[in-house]
Regions:
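Conserved lysine of the Walker
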Residues: 9-10
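DNA replication initiation on ssDNA origins
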Residues: 13
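Phosphate-binding/switch region of NTP-binding enzymes
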Residues: 1, 6, 127-179
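Phosphate-binding/switch loop-helix module in NTP-utilizing enzymes
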Residues: 80-142
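Cytosolic-facing regulatory segments adjacent to core modules
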Residues: 19-102, 116, 157, 166
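Generic beta-strand/beta-sheet core signal
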Residues: 2-4, 30-32, 84-86, 108-111, ...
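N-terminal cationic and glycine-rich segments that engage phosphates or anionic surfaces
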Residues: 16
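Conserved, well-folded catalytic cores of nucleic-acid-processing
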Residues: 19-20, 46-50, 78, 110-117, ...
Length: 179
């Protein structure tokens, strides 16, 4: 899922993950773009169909409080989404974790925020991302897991920092928010 900042990549990928989880798939989520607790609040708001702003501010109607309580109970019952704290984790760490997990669907939000501890100092950022993208593709093929990945576009509307991202992906969905 590729788009410019603010175009809704994280929201769309979250909706895909929630749908997969509701269908009984185990989802493992690596939120590199936002803190773990913020991603959890977004999942809760979406599940409760409550505005994010209301949930963040704590100013909720009785109906919204009931919807949140129901969503918490539902999420506990159907705990098919696992958020993984990836603070300081490299691409190698994340890929090893995916390999060990029993999940069906993986969410990486977003690719350009991944770092590769095996990269040499002389490697360009484009080369590092091409390597990460290629390794992710091989991991998906080897494990049979679906890997949903968000990616930024540059100012020219191209996948930022590496053409390999589009070449390695099975499908690329370009997200464009119209004003």
């Amino acid at each position: 899922f590729a788009g410019e900042p603010g175009d809704g990549k994280s929201t769309i990928i979250q909706n895909c993950a929630e749908t997969a989880a509701m269908d009984g798939k185990k989802v493992r989520w690596y939120p590199l773009e936002m803190p773990h607790n913020e991603q959890m609040l977004r999942l809760l708001a979406s599940s409760a169909q409550v505005d994010n702003g209301s949930l963040y501010s704590g100013v909720l109607t009785n109906g919204e409080c009931q919807a949140i309580a129901s969503a918490v109970a539902r999420l506990k019952r159907n705990a098919n989404v696992e958020l993984v704290d990836v603070e300081d984790a490299s691409a190698t760490d994340i890929f090893a974790d995916i390999e060990r997990s029993d999940c069906d669907v993986v969410v990486v939000d977003y690719l350009q925020l991944m770092e590769d501890s095996s990269a040499r100092k002389s490697d360009t950022r484009e080369g590092v991302l091409a390597s990460i993208s290629r390794r992710q593709k091989r991991l998906a093929r080897r494990t049979g897991k679906v890997i949903l990945t968000a990616s930024q576009l540059n100012d020219s509307g191209k996948l930022r920092e590496s053409r390999a991202i589009g070449q390695d992906a099975d499908k690329v969905y370009l997200i464009k928010k119209y004003a």
